[in-house]
Amino acid sequence: MEIGVSVAECKSVPGITSTPHSKDHSSPFYSPSHNGLLTDHHESLDNDVAREIQYLDEVLEANCCDSSVDGTYNGISSPEPGAAILVSSLGSPAHSATKVEPIEKASGRQLPPHIELSRSPSDSMAEGERANGHSTDQPQDMLGNSLQAPASPSSSTSSHCSSRDGEFTLTTLKKEAKFELRAFHEDKKPSKLFEEDEHEKEQFCIRKVRPSEEMIELEKERRELIRSQAVKKNPGIAAKWWNPPQKKTIEEQLDEEHLESHRKYKERKEKRAQQEQLQLQQQQQQQLQQLQQLQQQQQQQLSTSQLCTAPAAHEHLDSIEHTKEDVVTEQIDFSAARKQFQQMENSRQTLAKGQSTPRLFSIKPFYKPLGSINSDKPPTILRPATIGGTVEDSSTQAAKEQKALCVSESQSAGAGTGNAATQGKEGPYSEPSKRGPLSKLWAEDGEFTSARAVLTVVKDEDHGILDQFSRSVNVSLTQEELDSGLDELSVRSQDTTVLETLSNDFSMDNISDSGASNETPNALQENSLADFSLPQTPQTDNPSEGREGVSKSFSDHGFYSPSSTLGDSPSVDDPLEYQAGLLVQNAIQQAIAEQVDKAEVHTSKEGSEQQEPGAMVEEAGSQAPGSEKPQGMFAPPQVSSPVQEKRDVLPKILPGEDKTLREKGPSQPPTAVQPSGPVNMKETRPEGGYFSKYSEAAELRSTASLLATQESDVMVGPFKLRSRKQRTLSMIEEEIRAAQEREEELKRQRQVRQSTPSPRAQNAPSLPSRTTCYKTAPGKIEKVKPPPSPTTEGPSLQPDLAPEEAAGAQRPKNLMQTLMEDYETHKSKRRERMDDSSVLEATRVNRRKSALALRWEAGIYANQEEEDNE
């Protein structure tokens, strides 16, 4: 309140000074400023009062400029000092008025504020000297009224008020002055105390803002001080500061001996860089050449052979499609095309191991079954069929389904077109070449799709194994699907060899499971299946339980499909694998629908069989090939129609029933598998070899399958290519998972089949070995569970096979012994352990070479299994 009033009074001062009653006005003006109350004391203005006012004036002058500029920083308004000045010049009102203005100017007060203040006092006076006198809004005209009102000679009243207020004002001002001058106002007050002196003000400003040069000097001094102090405490610092160490080159620092090696190292590094650049350039050139070749080949194929594709393929390729007869009648040079595509794929992969490892290792299981299917048929028949619409259909549909799983339909159309264009061996291969990146992606992803794509494409060429089997068995189909599939599988196998990631192992396992699943349908289809089931690991694991092996492989197959479709398998752990599972689900659904819709169309063509394997591979990855193989075996010449029928059945069974088959599958597959069980065992051993790539246990089985020298050789090759480190790492993980799954499976089996303890015991041992095969594939360990349950049933049906398989499982321990010796020893051991809860443990030990894995599993699983048996 005081602030506002004082300001108003100060502004009103000029008007007051002009009037003759300046004294009176000053006194009332003061009274409102402090109390705003007029007391009825009729005392005239005293000399003491005048002195006090003068003193106040001085104090205000000292603070006036600051307060006015600060906007009454301390509650004292700048006008009040002005008023004080006016009072001091009681004798000469005019002089006081003039003085006030100069002060205002000196203080740097702005006129507008001054006007506002005058308004407020005038307003307060006009209203009867309102207590606040804070109405700044009143027009300036009120100033005259305010002057007149105070002009009334109420000098006594106003004089007394002024005296009283003077005292109060004095006290207040003193306090405020002290407050104003306090140190914490340093920023504002010191510079403004003497604002009247412009020079001083400028000096203050200069002091406040130091010039850059001065700041630089100060900073230098500060740093010097710091350094001098630091050097005293730590003299070593001085050397660094004052004599900064000069950087020495590596050559100067090294001794002569080291220097020489360093130079050599640099040279090697440079050479490497140059070589890498050259390699990159060469690779790029090769890729360009390959692309050109592919384009040329595709163009030639398109021109030579009209596109003849399955209904799905036709949808995408209607524009290119011409006549199916052309494709069938014109036989493309599949071998040459396939070779070209293989070369291209290998160069793309740029893997040190190249195709040999992938062939031996990734394609064996599946492709052997594929070859066996075709083997049932005369290879010549299959070739023409494959070359004809059949191959094209299979490749196109497979491509389409694969793409449906992994890629958009447009891509599938492109792949289908490539397949149709390349038709026959080349068609499938061109598809892989086209799909080359896709296959690689799938393989890298460790997706089930990759395995499926591989199955579909690998039909034609097995690279290592399939070539061996497919040459005699199914050249065209095997080559065709194997070509594209081979590349993907080889990529996968190489990845597995490198053991870059579990996902790779998983994908490899998926592939192996695919082979197993292929075997399972073959086993289901009986002896003809046995021929195809040669590569199937599951039955190799449980040769004694041919049915179990089949059911296992089937369940594995189902496992693979469900795991991919439903994300049950451990491979789902990887997001990529989970995505693969989703893709598989879509592929299975599409494949089932296409199978149902196109079964009739495909039955007319052998290509339908290929399509089905492609579709099935896409759906369940391995199941489709399995189903296809069995049918091929049943009606070798009529592979297409049987495959369609079987395919229609299997796709439906794969997702839902395969799981059931895993758990209860033995009942269904075992019957069909029983006849094929023994044969499957032999053929399965090769697949065991295929699995051996994944785990030594599988390798042992493959050795046991030395009976099938072809497969065993193939197995040995890829196995040798694999490094022990990778094997042990993947084996340990696989064995751990497999052991856990085995435990669960054994528990389930014991609970379900406690009624038949002895057969169960037999099954359990064979199961572990078999499970081992599956579990050797890290990705498939969990999937192995369902096969064991079928295995338990299987052993009763095929107890003889179990001993054989046991021998195969033991193979790792006694690789140098004869198969017969090992078989006998293992058989006797198994019989001894049949009723013992430690049977499973023994089997596990037999199949494993990894000491760590053996110890770990022996301790945990032996104890747990014993408890379960109890």
Curated annotation (Swiss-Prot):
Residues the record lists as Phosphoserine modifications: 122, 152, 347, 472, 476, 528, 641, 730, 758, 789, 796
GO function terms (MF aspect): protein domain specific binding; protein kinase A binding; protein-containing complex binding
Cite the location of the cross-link Glycyl lysine isopeptide (Lys-Gly) (interchain with G-Cter in SUMO1) from the record. Answer: 174
Q: Name one Pfam family in it.
A: AKAP2_C
State if Cell wall biogenesis/degradation is listed as a keyword. Answer: no
Phosphothreonine is found on 537
Q: Where is the composition biased (Polar residues)?
A: 133-151, 506-543, 755-774
Instruction: For this UniProt record, give its keywords in alphabetical order, as a comma-separated list.
Output: Cell membrane, Coiled coil, Glycoprotein, GPI-anchor, Isopeptide bond, Lipoprotein, Membrane, Phosphoprotein, Ubl conjugation
Segments of skewed composition (Basic and acidic residues): 259-274, 313-324, 595-608, 644-665
Bilayer topology reads: Lipid-anchor; GPI-like-anchor
Biased composition of type Low complexity is found at 152-161, 275-302, 410-424
Q: Give the residue range of the signal peptide.
A: none
**Which spans of this chain does the record mark as coiled coil?**
213-307, 720-755
Q: Region annotation Disordered: residue ranges?
A: 14-43, 103-165, 233-324, 409-436, 506-577, 595-688, 740-814
Question: Which terms under GO biological process does the entry name?
Answer: actin filament organization; cell surface receptor protein serine/threonine kinase signaling pathway; protein localization
The record's Gene Ontology cellular component field reads: apical plasma membrane; protein-containing complex; side of membrane
Q: Where is this cross-link: Glycyl lysine isopeptide (Lys-Gly) (interchain with G-Cter in SUMO2)?
A: 174
Region described as PKA-RII subunit binding domain: spans on this chain: 576-589
Q: Which locations, inside or outside the cell, does it occupy?
A: Apical cell membrane
Biological role stated in the UniProt entry: Binds to regulatory subunit (RII) of protein kinase A. May be involved in establishing polarity in signaling systems or in integrating PKA-RII isoforms with downstream effectors to capture, amplify and focus diffuse, trans-cellular signals carried by cAMP. Binds to and modulates the structure of the actin cytoskeleton.
Q: What is known of its domains?
A: The RII-alpha binding site, predicted to form an amphipathic helix, could participate in protein-protein interactions with a complementary surface on the R-subunit dimer.
| Name this protein carries in UniProt | A-kinase anchor protein 2
Organism field: Rattus norvegicus
